[in-house]
Amino acid sequence: VPRLQRRVAVSEGRSDIQRLIDVDSEPVVSGQYVVTTSFQGQVTVLDLATQRILWSENSSSINRPEVTDGKVIVSQTDGQIIAYDLITGQEIWENEQLLNRNLSNPVLLGSNLVVGDLDGYLHQIDLNSGTTLGRAKTSGEVRTLRVIDNQLYVSTRKGALSIWQSR
């Protein structure tokens, strides 16, 4: 029996293609909040305590968002990275330096964010300002990032796995 059901993505547009939406990423639970993203849809924060949508903003992402330090960080399908306030939904910063680079999910490594791209680069981004701090080359197009015990696990589209450690 479902405890809670809510629509987290609403389609818009005139044609069937424009109205196509898809929830490809896994939801992120942070305290009493659940954060979801959708392709050609929205980034949505649901408050489990009230069982209501706290806020929703138009966004297109196929990646799992990162939720940390009161921020929701989304890597959009166009390559823009946006940080929102977890409670208000207000945009804190945006980074447009990686447009059209088919970004991976953002992750927190140490005190900074990391995203991967189609050219096999890992980009380090300041969590508070969105400024790009540096980059490193991997073995191929980055698909998924995961951080466990301060180590960055990088998987590529061609099946390679590399493990990086924060300095």
Feature locations, PLM:
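Residue-level signal for well-ordered, solvent-exposed loop/turn and beta-edge residues enriched
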Residues: V1, Q51-R52, Q90, Y121, ...
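Extracytoplasmic beta-rich repeat domains
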Residues: R3-V28, R52-D69, I92-L109, R135-D149
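WD40 beta-propeller blade core
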Residues: T44, I82-A83, H123, S162
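Short loop/turn segments that connect beta-strands within beta-propeller blades
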Residues: D47-Q51, D85-G89, D126-G130, S166-R167
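Blade-level signature of beta-propeller repeat domains, shared across WD40, Kelch, NHL, RCC1
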Residues: T132, T138-R167
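Short coil/turn segments within WD40 beta-propeller repeats
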Residues: G41, G79-Q80, D119-Y121, G159
